[in-house]
Amino acid sequence: MKFLSDLLPVLLFFAAYSLTGNIYLATGVAIVSTAAQVGISWFKHRKVEPMQWVSLALILVLGGLTLVLHDKRFIMWKPTVLYWLLGAGFLISDLAFRKNPIKAMMGKQIELPERLWAKLTFAWSGFFAFMGALNLFVAFNFSEAVWVNFKLFGGMGLMLVFVLAQGMVLSRYIQEKN
């Protein structure tokens, strides 16, 4: 359920663009829906996840610049900035603070050696770097409509493939241990 909630602003952005072909209207929908998502989270739980704050800040700044300057390039940069912040955050957390973010998220569900946790963190950081670069490539080499479709379907599809590939690697390791 949380996954769908987190995906809602992207789905609404896509729906608004698909219905109108207007990236500025779709950007406004993304801003409002992200702000509403954070507000609802605060109202229901008296807590907002750090990623929701980051998403809200990015959509307010880059979406706001898109609307104020009437320049779609700002909203097209948003996924890249988010991906690169995530990748950098994973690396900084692991290398500078010796706190592996993947282990912090999954450590209670699965037991792995430290070297494998480190590999997972580097794999995710690399994936986020790749996704950020790929977003820019699509945004600035293809039509606006192609980018909007890539933002939802391409990004989600590649994420799913990456997660499944990691699941296969982890399942092989777990089977070896059992």
UniProtKB/Swiss-Prot annotation:
Residues spanning the membrane: 12-32, 50-70, 74-94, 120-140, 145-165
Keyword terms of this UniProt record: Cell inner membrane, Cell membrane, Membrane, Transmembrane, Transmembrane helix
Pfam hit, one: IspA
Primary localisation category: membrane
Keyword Iron-sulfur listed: no
Superkingdom field: Bacteria
Protein family membership: Belongs to the YciB family.
Protein name as catalogued: Inner membrane-spanning protein YciB
Originating species: Laribacter hongkongensis (strain HLHK9)
